[in-house]
Amino acid sequence: MSELKDCPLQFHDFKSVDHIKLCPRYTAVLSRSEDDGIGIEELDTLQLELETLLSSASRRLRVLEAETQILTDWQDKKGDRRFLKLGKEHELGTPIKHSKPKKQKLDGKVSHASGPGPGRPKSRNMQQKMQEYEFTDDPVDVPRIPKNDAPNRFWASVEPYCADITNDEIKVLEDLLKTPEDEADYYKIPPLGKHYSQRWAQEDLLEEQKDGARAALSGDKKKGILGPLAELDSKDVDSLLKKSDSQHDQPEDGCPFGHLTQRLLQALVEENIISPVEDSPIPEISGKESGTDGASTSPRSQNKPFSAPHTKSLEVRVKEELIAQGLLESDDRPADDSEDEVLAELRKRQAELKALSAHNRAKKQELLRLAKEEMNRQELRQRVRMADNEVMDAFRKIMAARQKKRTPTKKEKDQAWKALKERESILKLLDG
């Protein structure tokens, strides 16, 4: 009985997992037939319930392994203690005549008490018990539970966001607030290039010029035919294109002036200045004059369109003058600009970029302000920790004085009060 009392085993009461209550899906799947199978939507629930069963089994396994190790260690210590006692008796050389009466006395007192005296029979009993508690190694290795490293990885990923703000991070924010040098380039509108029809025409002329130069080298006849075209250069091509544009770009009404110039002249001309046809006398034209006039005016000269120099510059000057006088708004653009889809889209995206950059700049300024405030709070928290250490030091000194049954000195009391007041003032600053 004494051996059972000294046994360090705890004999845990293992509670079995209630499958019906804790693992209802697992129980339902076991009760089905093989033909029913398992649905895809049930896999997540089954995984959780199987993990619950695995954790319960691993917990029981760990407890049993701990109990086995405790039992083995206890038997080893007990055997070593008894073998040491036997060795000491043999070294002392106890005579046999003294041991026999003791053995007889022990045999006579077996019914009354069983003392734990040293001897051969006890060692045999100990060996038998050791054989009883020997555990054979299971050939099947128990699978090791994988280490759950998810919390460590989670906190390692969160730590940079919860760490204290440093001066380097403040410097990074200040650098981000600086205006980049190339910011103005994003708001520039590139000049309008040549129209694709003009560019293609120029490319066609240049290509014909190259073809003519190649053909001129082949023979004199071809050189005589294509020579003038082959001698053209890029400047001649541009002049030809401008000439063709000036001939074909005449308005439908034949007037070379722009819309603003025409509207201005229409506003200045007085209406109803032509008298009726009946009242106006018809002048008589002599035959000589009519002959000369008839000879001078030909159908070809009548069909020739009217042209005036510097009409485009006149249109621009009229527009500038009307804007300066306040008769025309400066935002009014010509019809070509208003119909330019690329320019409209470019202006739209530039406006969005301005709004977005302004929003980002405001957020960065707010973030910089909050970071500087947090830096000040970090310094206050550091001072609070130092004040806490001072308060704890003063408290230890006072407690040590009371343990020695002496009253704390005035210096110790003043130091404690000073530390407490300083801590309160720092906390007020931190809360404020």
From Swiss-Prot:
Residues 335-398 form a coiled coil. It comes from the Eukaryota. One of its GO terms (molecular function) is transcription coactivator activity. Residues 293-305 have a biased composition (Polar residues). One of its GO terms (cellular component) is nucleus. Residues 90-127, 275-314 are annotated as: Disordered. GO terms for biological process: regulation of transcription by RNA polymerase II. InterPro entries: Histone_AcTrfase_su3 (IPR019340). It is found in: Nucleus. Keywords: Coiled coil, Nucleus, Transcription, Transcription regulation. PANTHER family: TRANSCRIPTIONAL ADAPTER 3, TRANSCRIPTIONAL ADAPTER 3-RELATED. Belongs to the NGG1 family. Functions as a component of the PCAF complex. The PCAF complex is capable of efficiently acetylating histones in a nucleosomal context. This is Transcriptional adapter 3-A. It comes from Xenopus laevis (African clawed frog).
